[in-house]
């Protein structure tokens, strides 16, 4: 058996998230459907670095699966991309040992969130950026960002629906990039709770709008209560950008 690692990109707009759900189109479902065809009807389960929500995009999602088929890496890439729909692309294929695990071997993840600063919607970017029509004080956002960096209990910044009991995570970097009429938030951490990036982005936008003080972030973290943080930003501005592994 070979263990195959794939780096996957997808446009999340027409998916109900990554993970298989009955009666809904998902990324995992489409990948496993393609693998089933390649394996002559045999079901092949894939493991992913993590789940993404409905409408969330990925540039660097990582999956693995085990297979009895002996194909070269380029053959896997070509075969899967031929069978997958246009909104999923296998960017890279690597053969790994059985010690590799797409989920349990993750060292850090990078997410990016795009915000379009415009009162007018952009018809070509509407599915890929969060259009924000209100003026923002960027310096206030920059002042708030360092409070999130480090190891914290992020209960205040995750969905109540999360199934994780341990809410402690480490954020290594948060960068605010100003690019033409967009601002891009770049997050690097050892892991992220359900909706965590989107809630932090929503909170930072509230800071930029003057609804929250930058220096209130430590208090919000300490309260460990979701109701004190800002609104959650929508899914379509979020990208799973890159996943790094221990080995």
Curated annotation (Swiss-Prot):
The active site is at 53 (nucleophile). Substrate binds at residue 111. Formation of pseudouridine at positions 38, 39 and 40 in the anticodon stem and loop of transfer RNAs. The lineage of its organism: Bacteria, Bacillati, Bacillota, Bacilli, Bacillales. The keyword Cell membrane does not apply. InterPro entries: PsdUridine_synth_cat_dom_sf (IPR020103), PsdUridine_synth_TruA (IPR001406), PsdUridine_synth_TruA_a/b_dom (IPR020097), PsdUridine_synth_TruA_C (IPR020095), TruA/RsuA/RluB/E/F_N (IPR020094). Belongs to the tRNA pseudouridine synthase TruA family. It catalyses: uridine(38/39/40) in tRNA = pseudouridine(38/39/40) in tRNA. This is tRNA pseudouridine synthase A 1. GO terms for biological process: tRNA pseudouridine synthesis. Homodimer. The gene is truA1. Its EC number is 5.4.99.12.
């Amino acid at each position: 058996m070979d263990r195959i690692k794939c780096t996957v990109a997808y446009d999340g707009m027409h998916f109900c998230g990554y993970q298989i759900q009955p009666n809904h189109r998902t990324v995992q479902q489409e990948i496993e459907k393609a693998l089933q065809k390649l394996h002559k009807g045999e079901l092949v389960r894939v493991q992913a670095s993590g789940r993404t929500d409905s409408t969330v995009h990925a540039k660097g999602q990582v999956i693995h699966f085990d297979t009895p088929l002996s194909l070269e890496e380029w053959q896997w890439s070509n075969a899967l991309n031929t069978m997958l729909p246009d909104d999923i692309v296998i960017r890279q294929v690597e053969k790994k040992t059985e010690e590799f695990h797409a989920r349990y071997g993750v060292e850090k993840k990078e997410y990016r969130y795009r915000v379009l600063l415009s009162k007018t919607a952009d018809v070509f970017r509407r599915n890929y950026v969060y259009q924000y029509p209100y003026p923002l004080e960027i310096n206030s956002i920059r002042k708030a960002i360092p409070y999130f960096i480090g190891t914290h209990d992020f209960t205040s910044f995750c969905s109540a629906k999360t199934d994780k009991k341990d809410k402690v995570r480490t954020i290594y970097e948060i960068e605010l990039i100003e690019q033409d009429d967009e601002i891009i938030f770049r997050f690097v951490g050892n892991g992220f709770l359900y909706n965590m990036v989107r809630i932090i982005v929503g909170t930072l936008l509230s800071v930029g709008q003057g609804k929250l003080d930058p220096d209130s972030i430590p208090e919000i973290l300490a309260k460990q209560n979701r109701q004190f943080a800002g609104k959650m930003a929508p899914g379509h501005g979020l990208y799973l950008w890159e996943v790094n592994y221990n080995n």
